Regions:
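Short, polar loop motifs at secondary-structure junctions
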Residues: 47-50, 176-177
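Amphipathic alpha-helical hairpins
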Residues: 29-33, 49, 68, 80
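Intrinsically disordered, low-complexity, positively biased terminal segments
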Residues: 6-7, 12, 17-21, 31-42, ...
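Conserved N-terminal entry element of GNAT/NAT acetyltransferase domains
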Residues: 69-86
Length: 220
């Protein structure tokens, strides 16, 4: 469980070894996490088969996230810059709007991960989107991918893929944004996994049409 601020936290997945499943250990883990985060609103991405269990605890479905994968094929695009060249306060403000909660300490570390690339889109002198591509167990993952418009998201996707060309790359897209799905399909990405985004006290007010990729299934 990650506490982002006084009002919001996010649950990662619970993994119980097969021989211990069905004995209540998973529910106990959830209860410990709930105690840890207190009265905050909680978000999570439930894997198939787990949504009903979380609903019994008061969580409600918001939308589906689908992970798409492809071989990274991209190119540099105009107006795309290293995100660290942009004043951090601007990046943090943009992220807060699109994530639904301030996560300043987390964000500073996220965009500075080793062997990762964080890029921003500048339009008319201001930040109009950003994305991060980071190494994972198999290739790379893009997340988050936030942008004011589909063409900006496309430019960011291409520029991020250019940095890791030829490697497997994944993008976790909210299905509630049809333009996010269209981006994945346009670049011939294939769906490989899905999860249900759920919240305990209601979904934060989010510009869903600007969210093309969530940060991760484990972190929100």
């Amino acid at each position: 469980a990650v506490i982002y601020n006084d009002f919001f936290a996010f649950f990662g997945g619970d993994i119980v070894r097969p021989e211990y499943r069905g004995q209540g250990y998973g529910m106990r883990l959830i209860q410990v996490k709930q105690t840890y985060v207190g009265r905050r609103n909680i978000g999570l991405d439930a894997v198939p088969g787990m949504a009903e269990k979380y609903m019994r605890l008061g969580f409600r479905e918001a939308f589906r996230n689908v992970r798409y994968e492809a071989k990274a094929v991209g190119q540099d695009r105009p107006g795309i810059v290293d995100l660290r060249r942009i004043p951090f306060r601007e990046v943090a403000a943009y992220d807060t709007v699109h994530f639904g909660a301030a996560r300043v300490g987390f964000l500073r570390r996220w965009i500075n991960q080793p062997d990762s690339f964080a890029l921003g889109a500048i339009r008319q002198g201001r930040l109009a989107g950003f994305g991060v591509v980071r190494p994972c167990r198999r290739g790379y993952r893009i997340g988050p991918l936030f942008a004011d418009a589909p063409d900006i998201a496309d430019d960011l996707y291409l520029a991020l893929c250019h940095r890791v060309a030829g490697k497997p790359v994944a993008l976790d897209t909210p299905q509630i944004n049809p333009e996010a799905v269209a981006l994945a399909e346009r670049h011939k990405m294939k769906p490989v996994r899905e999860a249900t985004r759920m919240y305990l006290k209601g979904m934060p007010e989010l510009p869903l049409d600007h969210i093309f990729g969530v940060t991760s299934f484990e972190l929100g």
